[in-house]
Regions:
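Active-site recognition of the HExxH zinc-binding catalytic motif
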Residues: 84-96
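Metalloprotease/metallohydrolase-associated module, dominated by Zn2+-dependent proteases
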Residues: 2-80, 99-179
């Protein structure tokens, strides 16, 4: 009896992910090269990882000169990743290198997005996140049922925080369902 089981990954899906990783890596290189040409700089290509989980599409680790991407959202939205997420994250690195610590989506970042990469500077993605959404707990108020994440639910249970409804301003209460 095996101690663990491997996920069912087909050769075709592995090849598809390798192709997507290659496309992302190539797009990152193109963005860096374009920024170097446009801004007369010599930025090196960042390290790239595909290990983010949850709802986050991408992340720039500024001091490490590293980009991280969500492989699930990438597989579900490859074209949008290449056209929007990669320039978004590369812009964070460029802004950090040129201006230091500034507001993450401030005027410097917006300028790099629009003037260097010719991409609309959106701060969030609009991908369907059903496949990466975690478990939620139904909390009730006087006007609605509001799902809270595991993290927020645990904070409520430890009495570290109490959430209130934005509409009716009443406290959110968890009513566990009976078995």
């Amino acid at each position: 009896m095996p101690l663990f089981t491997l996920p069912a990954v087909t050769i075709q899906s592995a090849k598809a992910m390798n192709e997507l990783h290659y496309r992302i890596t190539r797009r990152v290189s193109e963005c860096i090269s374009h920024a170097n040409l446009t801004l007369n700089t010599e930025f090196s290509a960042p390290a790239i990882r595909f290990d983010i989980r949850g709802k986050t599409a991408g992340m720039a680790l500024l001091q490490r000169w590293q980009l991280r991407f969500n492989p699930v959202l990438l597989a579900e939205n490859p074209d949008a990743f290449i056209e929007e997420v990669v320039p978004h994250e590369v812009s964070h690195l460029i802004v950090f290198a040129r201006f230091g610590r500034v507001r993450p989506h401030g005027k410097e970042w917006q300028s790099v997005m629009s003037q260097v990469f010719d991409v609309q500077p959106k701060t969030t993605h609009s991908f369907d996140i059903k496949s990466v959404e975690g478990k939620t707990f139904p909390y009730h108020c006087e006007c609605d049922v509001i799902p809270l994440s595991v993290r927020r639910h645990n904070k409520v249970q430890r009495q570290q925080v109490q959430y209130v409804c934005r509409r009716c301003k009443q406290p959110l209460v968890w009513k566990p369902s009976s078995p």
